[in-house]
Amino acid sequence: MMRTHYCGALNRNNIGQDVTLSGWVHRRRDLGGLIFIDMRDRDGIVQVYFDPKYQDALTAAASLRNEFCIQIKGEVIARPENQINKNMATGEVEVLAKELRIYNASDVLPLDFNQNNTEEQRLKYRYLDLRRPEMAQRLKTRAKITSFVRRFMDDNGFLDIETPMLTKATPEGARDYLVPSRVHKGKFYALPQSPQLFKQLLMMSGFDRYYQIVKCFRDEDLRADRQPEFTQIDVETSFLTAPEVREIMERMVHGLWLDTIGVDLGKFPVMTWQEAMCRFGSDKPDLRNPLEMVDVADIVKDVEFKVFNEPANNPNGRVAVIRVPNGAEITRKQIDEYTQFVGIYGAKGLAWAKVNDINVGLEGVQSPIAKFLNEEVWKALAERVNAQTGDILFFGADKWQTTTDAMGALRLKLGRDLGLTRLDEWQPLWVIDFPMFERDEEGNLAAMHHPFTSPKDFSPEQLEADPTSAVANAYDMVINGYEVGGGSVRIFDPKMQQTVFRILGIDEEQQREKFGFLLDALKFGTPPHAGLAFGLDRLTMLLTGTENIRDVIAFPKTTAAACLMTEAPSFANPQALEELAISVVKAE
């Protein structure tokens, strides 16, 4: 037998037992004729010592170095009282080695487990990086999450059904990864960006509660929390309303947090998209941050200051204020840095006002814009934002979207910089009632979620007549500023689906070509259905306390969508390309 126990599982209950351990040398120390090692496996670390009493084992141990793969047979001993290590789960015991077997030696490591290695090093030698206890713990947490999800889904009547990986390219927002067909030359499969249409087809097939933990693929620009291939917890239901779907999914996430880290998330508040954007400048607000945006266009619309009065009198403009309690100590240098920061989001500047004494009106205000205000306007502003002595006010004034984006980003930065964001809290919420459509860069209407989302209380005729007023029957789950899941009630009427396609500029010929199978299926007694998808990688990221999604994926890609370990992507074999009838055009 190669193993009787995991290293990290040993405790006082094992004292006096003979055990067989298999794992790696984590650290080695020589002390006065004895050799000590910390031995590690996926479950943790235990101290092992070699005593002259077992000379063969001690002699063999002299050759041990870090990351040798070994087997130990020995006895679990209680540590002396003064040697108990409270920082180790196994710190009350140690193992007296009676036999040592070296499975494999190790070359000098290209990584140093005791120092910060570059991410490039960690990804190139990922198989070594994953030996680190913190990395092993993250992957164990991920496995625990998926195990919990499967149990919950099974207990709630959901069926785990697989959907195809080789499918048809359909417009879902990002570029597809294409797979050439050898049999059908000149044609391509697409790897799925999500199982969206297949799970809707499963509802039409009568499987009223479906789920799947599934790989998805998107060829898009990457960030710290995105990967070209990622994992979704994908869910779809029939005959349930949006609030009923949210209730089930909230119970799942509530239970997941309790099971994984022992945290009770409480009841999730529900907030409309409009409220989230107006108060927090984001459709995924981080409610740990107490700062809010307050609209003041009605107060400043008549001041003789174009920066304020122009957007204040423009239906598409916005003037908003963030009050920072006790922020008057912020220096001019810091204010200049914040002004530069909002410029990234298109803001032309950042007005500010320090409240040195709230009791003396404008006389107590220090601000380059004070000369444009009068006592009446200042009083109204101070009352609107509840200004107090020692506060600073930051003003954003521009187009609605620019002000909202810039001030929303500033809110987050101020919260971090000034220590206002309560990092030890969990703040979940649902965001609902998104706009059905938004304008793309060319000014055309695009679906804010996807083209299969149902509008709220709109007929096809009403939607076609006034699409920009339509509210989507959609919902996102947000935790601490991260969108962890999103879903919607789906369109189940063929006339409504064709109307949405037309609004998006997809003519009837394109509809038949791209979505003919869906439009046909909608004609045969389609049930009302709704669903949601969670990002498993992002959930794991939150539950393990890391800010980099690559830390919770065993073998992730870089931000350039490359695998440094296997050197993928690579050039294809010319013969394989010939069989696929593909010629490669060299980049200029």
From Swiss-Prot:
Gene3D superfamilies in the cross-refs: Bira Bifunctional Protein, Domain 2 (3.30.930.10), GAD-like domain (3.30.1360.30), Nucleic acid-binding proteins (2.40.50.140)
GO cellular component, one term: cytoplasm
GO BP terms in the entry: aspartyl-tRNA aminoacylation
HAMAP family: Asp_tRNA_synth_type1
Binding, ATP: 218-220, 227, 483, 535-538
Primary location group: cytoplasm
Record's subunit section: Homodimer.
Localization per Swiss-Prot or TrEMBL: Cytoplasm
InterPro entries per the UniProt record, alphabetical: Aa-tRNA-synt_II (IPR004364), aa-tRNA-synth_II (IPR006195), aa-tRNA-synth_II/BPL/LPL (IPR045864), Asp-tRNA-ligase_1 (IPR004524), Asp-tRNA-ligase_1_N (IPR047089), Asp/Asn-tRNA-synth_IIb (IPR002312), AspRS_core (IPR047090), GAD-like_sf (IPR004115)
Record keyword Iron present: no
UniProt key word Ligase: yes
Protein name, per record: Aspartate--tRNA ligase
One MF annotation (Gene Ontology) recorded for this entry: ATP binding
PANTHER family given in the database record: ASPARTATE--TRNA LIGASE, MITOCHONDRIAL (PTHR22594:SF5), ASPARTYL/LYSYL-TRNA SYNTHETASE (PTHR22594)
Protein residues bound to L-aspartate: 172, 218, 449, 490
Entry EC number(s): 6.1.1.12
Annotated stretches, region: Aspartate: 196-199
Summary of the function given for this chain in its UniProt record: Catalyzes the attachment of L-aspartate to tRNA(Asp) in a two-step reaction: L-aspartate is first activated by ATP to form Asp-AMP and then transferred to the acceptor end of tRNA(Asp).
Similarity section: Belongs to the class-II aminoacyl-tRNA synthetase family. Type 1 subfamily.
